[in-house]
Amino acid sequence: MSKIKILIPVYNDWQSVFKLLENIDRGLDSWSPDVAHISVLIVNDSSTEERPINNFTFNSLKSIQVINMKENKGHARCIAAGLKHISENNDFDLVIPMDADGEDRPEELGILLCKAYELPDKVITANRIKRSEGFIFKFCYLAHKYLTIIFTGQSIKYGNYTCLPKFAVNQMINDSATWSSFSGSLAKTVREKDRTSISSTRGTRYFGPSKMSFINLIKHSLSIMAVFKTTLLIRSIIFLITYLFLIIGNISIITLIPILAVISMLISAMILSRRENMSEFNNSLENIQSIDKIK
């Protein structure tokens, strides 16, 4: 029987977390008990919101633990610390990182695991084919996706919602990029031939508006690019040389905008690449204040 850990980072969104846990538990009711041993690890990123008392009886999930962090480190670093904790403290076959807010749909867990059982030596990513956000966010996300392809050569259609075999977890916890960008690190550490995907529809948040602001989307995009900073630097230089050659004799404030944009992007990505700190990552479990057991 496969031992599966669902990894959920959370910051001040306990209502969504418990809604997600209830939906996962109810969804597992129809599963044969011999299919998988599924437990949950929640990484509490030093939430200021008090965790509510749970009144729901979990029947299908085998265990639910909450790691309480001393200091807030951010979403990506919560996942990184969670992967490290699972690797060092748990016997597991697969890890499934999920966002707590409902945008990673628990209804797709079965599809994800079926694919993982079919291809046990591959990472399974949930690639977005449909998003639930408004037009402006969708446009910005599309721009992020194509800029990432153009300047890094990486087509990253997935977020945190993935199914990671043990080999992938071991590779990711030994790479500093995981401390800054989960999806960027996955693309870097696991070869494309060792990855496959399922089609995924982005769910709607259980409660409240999305916390992914325009600024956070830019930071997210640049953090992915920063993982491939050498490729980014080379392609940016090629772009700038080619573009300057094409506009020579027609230089104006308007034609200089793309140059300034690419230079700004490059500098910002290089600054963000300094977040990839292996020493901090290795010591991340020292940030654990306590561990609570919900089940």
Region spans (language model):
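Cell-envelope/extracellular polymer assembly enzymes that use nucleotide-activated donors
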Residues: K3-K5, S39
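Short, well-formed alpha-helical segments that are part of the catalytic scaffolds
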Residues: D13-S30
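Short beta-strand/loop segment that forms part of the nucleotide-sugar
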Residues: S32-S47, I67-N68
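A conserved acidic beta->alpha catalytic loop
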Residues: L41-I53, G102-E103
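Acceptor/aglycone-binding surface of glycosyltransferases and processive sugar-polymer synthases
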Residues: M69-E71, H75-H85, P97, E103-S180, ...
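Short acidic donor-binding loop at the edge of a beta-strand
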Residues: N90-L94
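Catalytic donor/gating beta->alpha subdomain of glycosyltransferases that bind UDP-sugars
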Residues: N170-L232
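Terminal low-complexity segments of carbohydrate-biosynthetic enzymes
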Residues: T231-K295
